[in-house]
Amino acid sequence: MKRFAHHTAQSIREAVRLLKAYEGKARVNAGGTDLLGAMRDKSLPSYPEAVIDIKTIEGLDYVRKDSKGLRIGALARLADVAASEEVKAEYGLLAEAIRTVASPTIRNMATLGGNLAQDVRCWYYRYPRQIGGPIVCLRKGGKICSALAGDNRYHSLFGAVPLAEYPCSSHCPAETDIPGYMDRIKKGDLAGAARILMEYNPIPAVTGRVCPVFCEPECNRSEFDDAVAIQCVERGVGEYVLENAAVYYAPPGNETGKQVAIVGSGPAGLAAAFYLRKAGHRVTVYERLPEPGGMLFHSIPPFRLPKDVVRRQIEALAGMGIAFEAGVDVGKSVTMADLAGAFDAIVAACGTWRSLRLGVPGEEAEGLHYALEYLKRINSGERPPLGRRVVVVGGGSVAIDAARCARRMGSEDVHVVCLECRDPASKDRMLALDSEIRQAEEEGIQIHPSLGVQKILVKDGHVSGIDAVTCLSVREPNGSFNPQYELTCTAATLEADSVIIAIGQAADPADTEAVKRAVGTVLFAGDMVSGPSTVIQAVASALQAVRAVESALNPGRPEARVVKPGPLFVEAYLDDSPRAPAAELPVFQRMRGIDAEDSPGASLAVVEGEARRCFNCGCLAVEPSDVGVALVALDARIVTTKRTVGAAAFFNARATCSTILDADELIREIRIPKPPEGARQKYAKFTLRKPIDFAIVSVASMVVVKDGVCKDARIVLGAVAPEPLRAKGAEGAMRGQPIDERVATEAAEAAVQGSLPLAMNDYKRSITKALVKRSVMGE
């Protein structure tokens, strides 16, 4: 056993002081029957620096009856509580539960407070380090509950404790509740899934096509087979949203009378417009180009994002009452001062439309194009001639888009030259998505990684090719851009009829200057805040701008978007099905032009099937306390050093703990009200061997019977969920009914309604029903 500091506290105050001093790195020893063994086995998530012994604190081992009921000190030994005449006389349920705990020796040592605060008994969590190293389950900082795909015969029958932060959601810039909307789809509630998704992202039909899916690499499903195809599901929900635009883009119920101008109609501008209009403001969106949509319409090729989708998205937003003013160049045809005088707030979401120059000799020659301008021209219907041989300089998505457009429009020999390497694990990897690079190579485009353009070759005033040198590294260890080259020789020479530069972009200086001169409430969103970013990053930025606008226009008013608390338990899935393959046109069809969408999308059946693959990540360990189940049935209250809560609220399990106790919080007392007159109390427990083993299933019941009819009931299930679970369905089936075989059977069936058996624990349903039936009948 490792060394640790040991402190013997003489008072509750001293114990709390010590716990605070160790800042969560100390553990409390309240009985000594579990903690030291766990430390010896090194099974805890982290080894404590100190153990605070509170067994010697005087005055907390009482069992007292008063006019309100029973009061038990937190350090009362279990054996003493069970032997108490007051407990045996009126609280037989508690006495029965205690008698099933462990052995007489342990009951003579263990305390009531210690039993309530004990750690879970999941064997993955408790696996001794000495046997073969720790099992890094969810409670120990792992990504997934080991029981989900492993042996789960003793685990939860009613779902998992949801994570406070899901890996997929936390890596989404908009923090989208991905498990939330997946769960709705599993239950056949596509409308509910759409409502959840729209809280975070109002353009899912767009992001479902062009999002770089920061979420999918973090999906825990990849530990089992393949990550959930989140983008496929999002696109399916997005299509449903656009098909039902009148529902999801409805005008607000109340108007605030405030007016907001949005400069720019790209993803940030559209998202900001949606949320501000939803809040009740009048919104006008200004777009410099002839048609709204910003980068979505004028930069992304139609084979990735069809123009019809963008137009339908704009029409849906216009249906909310959002006004779009296209062909208006803010700063020229209308000034920021004009907008400031007419609107209560302005959101500047102008984007980054100025292409960065390469800064090498030959950049002024004819036949040299900048990617954004080139893409804007082809998206407007032009087909600029490039010649047979094209070199695209850059390693991001824009470069790949430009290269694929050139190849599809007739250029036979297309090359992409970039500083970045192809190693996906390197800090210097290409910024384009792997899928984009794969598709480009399928279409005959050659990628030349780790090369930097030294000069552009010129013949008769027209580009004729490039000379390139080896790029040794692109970024410093801290991530800053600082390419290093091997300049002693030319690494490659490529001939070209056209060269397209796609090395990045920045905000137009005119836009920046116009915004700087603006007065009033002006907020920034999208690329003007972060520089070039993805569509979902622009949406996330818009949400921040909207909150700032709301704060400025309505000081003191709560945020318009309130994320509702998640469910108590979530359904843990292990649907043994492979990831749906992405639907994609064959290469020969893709090469016919740029107008047909590469990915036709998935059917609703495929979307639903993919959603069912979501693990709904959570912890499946069950609450181990026999006494806790009894106290919930008795409607007890737990008094701590910080608060007084009902027993049901005390066992508020989370993925990394089982109770509400803070690191510096201790139980002082347990208060149990007088049982109702005529209450029949029962504790039933099923174990594999001796009654003192940990429960496979337990049932604590308190049934109030008068003249053979149930007047009230509290039935609590133990060892079937991450915390003691009220069987409210069973209680409802009993109230007002005669206590007989029929009612007991109905109550037993109701008790397991909503259960979510895992691969190996369906047997718990039968045991639960049998114990509930016996408890109702008083057997």
Mark where each language-model region is:
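Long, charged amphipathic helices and adjacent flexible linkers at domain junctions
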Residues: 244-260, 471, 565-578
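Rossmann-like dinucleotide-binding cores of NAD(P)H-dependent redox enzymes
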Residues: 282-285, 289-319, 324, 378, ...
